[in-house]
Amino acid sequence: RDVLGSRGLGDVYKRQHAVSVLMKNGDWASLHYPEIVKASNFGRTIFDKRGWLWATSSRIESGGLFCLNYNGTIADTSDDQHRFITRFTNQDGALLEQLAVYCIAEDKEGVIWIGTNRGPLVLNNPSRYFNDNFYCTQIKVPRNDDSGLADFLLVNEAINAIAIDGANRKWIGTASNGIYLISADGMETIHHFTEENSPLLSNSIVSIAIHPRTGEVFIGTGKGLVSYQSDATEAENSFKESNVRAYPNPVRPDYSGVITVTGMVYDSDVKIVDTAGHLIYQGTSLGGQFTWDGRNKQGRRVATGIYMVLAADSEGKEGIVTKIAFIK
């Protein structure tokens, strides 16, 4: 169900001095907030898990980030919480000068990720946005060169698009340097795709969207659309036999690719054992999907036989079993 539709809203705009909301019944509602009078028009908008509206405004001189908690009453602004911030301070107390805000996304943990002309900013506790002592976080990535130094994540990149995949990883599209796949905590760059090392049509990324069931990542560039088959999908809420599927199955002698198991819950602990109960391989699902290269812990291709896939949630309270057949 569409997030806007579930709240009875059709679309949200900034028109002149107000936030204009097109209701599902076709009527317009205008919400007036003094702090956005001089702001440029809204760019990207999202509703987070709390139902709060976040809207970007990208101009350096008059742009920023607007947040609105309308408390479920569109027509009554007297109980609203709202704030438009144009000057951001990081966790070290440093003022981020000449900042332009381009995009925004909420991850699986409710953390807000903001794309700017100076890399990504993170709101680990979005409810503090209305506080006077609010600050954003610039993730520090250690250099791991014995210097003890760290660099801010993608600080020299202009971030045009951010999308969150089923494993809570961040797909970050830049204005001129392709697309990055960043680990869930932001500390590791898993992939960096450019037009030089991948089928990307351009290093200028305009938008990113991810199909929740298949994990396919659709990347809009300045020269057209391209897709990439990711190894993470949206997780299931619970294990169901009808949702769990392994493919290819059986695995035939001429197949050398990965075996995929879908229908997992988030961060499933997965073990593959033979019929004697010996552990062959284990790992953690990426969102709702787990992949295996068909090899044991020593790196050798497994023998002909039936292998059991034992999956359990991260707390060990729920699990499921499926089978994979190998033919050699």
Per-segment meaning from a language model:
Residues L279-V302, D313-K317:
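Glycine-centered tight-turn motifs at strand-turn-strand junctions
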Residues D269-I280, Y307:
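Short, glycine-anchored, charge-dense loop/turn motifs used at functional sites
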Residues M308-K328:
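C-terminal tail/sorting-segment detector
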Residues D2-Y13:
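Single conserved hydrophobic/aromatic residue that forms the stacking wall/gate
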Residues F47-R50, E106-E109, I164-A167, I210-T214:
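Residue-level detector of Asp-centered blade-edge/turn motifs that repeat once per structural unit
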Residues S238-K271, Q289-W292:
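Glycine-centered coil/turn sites that cap beta-strands in beta-rich domains
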Residues G119-L121, S204-F239:
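Blade-level signature of beta-propeller repeat domains, shared across WD40, Kelch, NHL, RCC1
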Residues K24-W28, L68-D79, N124-C136, S183-M187, ...:
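Short loop/turn segments immediately following beta-strands, especially the blade-tip
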